[in-house]
Curated annotation (Swiss-Prot):
The keyword Transmembrane is assigned to this record: yes
Keyword Membrane found: yes
EC supergroup of this enzyme: transferase
UniProt-listed PROSITE patterns: LGT
Similarity annotation: Belongs to the Lgt family.
GO CC annotation terms, alphabetical: plasma membrane
Main location: membrane
Residues holding a 1,2-diacyl-sn-glycero-3-phospho-(1'-sn-glycerol): 139
Domain of life, source organism: Bacteria
Protein name: Phosphatidylglycerol--prolipoprotein diacylglyceryl transferase
Amino acid sequence: MLTFPRIDPVAITLGPLQFRWYGLMYLFGFLSGWWLGRRRAAQPGSRWTGEMVDDMVTYVILGVVLGGRIGYILFYDLAYYLGNPTQIFSIWNGGMSFHGGLLGVVFAMWLLGRRNGLGFMDVSDFVAPLIPPGLFFGRIGNFINGELWGKHTTLPWGMVFPDGGPFPRHPSQLYECALEGVILFLALWVFSSRKRPTGHVSGLFALLYGVFRFTVEFVREPDVQLGYLAFGWLTMGQVLCLPLIMLGLWLLRPGGDKGTKAA
């Protein structure tokens, strides 16, 4: 059994200003996406420029923050925020939805494509490999906040969390770091290093993320305000992953888009 390493959620204090680890993790995620995007844009045959990557990051930041927060409110705890509307803006305390953020990013990519004369799937295939590092840092932020822990476990790496009771739990945030952050990034980076049919990089992202998240949800404690939605095991996270898995399979289907290009 491991004990949760109590970490002050405030990383840096400068006078009246406080910089929380949770917010810094988002900053690290955006910076890593920008750096990787610049590398991809510099590859031979790329239709992207450094300036387009800079614009892309700006669009994505707005999509992630607005979509992630709105998605969490709508999907996970609408009643609470209707009763406490001032808490809607307290994103430094946590409460972001990946699926809401993804919808925000989809809208941002559509706007970016229109502005630069690129097809939506062209933008999506370029952006997909840049997302996993952000997921990695986001889950580290969840871990530092001591939130989104897993179910009780007797495994030797089970961890006692401050607000999780006296029994060890799965450190499900770290599972997601490994699967959605490290493994997903490596798979997409290698896969996109060669020319692929349009939509295949996006399809692989949707499929693998959906499968990884769906799987981890089995050991992750469901949100207390929602519990299980069906069958005594189906969570909101799993429900939201099912369309992603189906979309990924459809984009990767044999005989799909034949337009082969460098992603």
